[in-house]
């Protein structure tokens, strides 16, 4: 699966508001819109330890192996141990950090890095997030990142303004070995937004569920009418398969 959790210091937790480009997932809510329930997002985004010790997810594209350290979460995409998506986490947030550049070269990658906030400039979700439609929301004005052709050779880029939201819970039937009406949360990641956090040209959705972690990912682009076009890339992770790998990294 070649999904790009494409790269987003001022970070603001904001109250829910009306956005001219509706970003809600195309799903039916199952809870009251004013729900105040909070969710441990690390446990929703990662396969449970009892499963991940000997299993991984597979589906319509590449496999997905979950590995954890005390401060990093790896989604490894092949049996070779790379490429990967690497998220950082602490008691406050889970942060997008590293994704691949060349699937065949672990010394090439894209990494969020800000002159002011270092590697913590793109919080994806609060560590403990509020549910809702939407629930927790984060606005990011500094989306600085680096494109590395080698460990120490890189160019600097940015994604414009970014807004990340948690939506749900929902009930989804995603096929494969997953149960019907699986309870999910949807992380909406919108980037290349204008300075008002509107007209975000790109939107990605991470659909996560216990005890599996990531069960669906999709990308949409903003249409000329100001609404999001149907997904142009969708991947399902709906099979639990035996086997685990250790991430292979060369530069971090």
Segment roles from a protein language model:
Residues 2-9:
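Sec-dependent signal peptide recognition
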Residues 24-252:
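Conserved functional acidic sites
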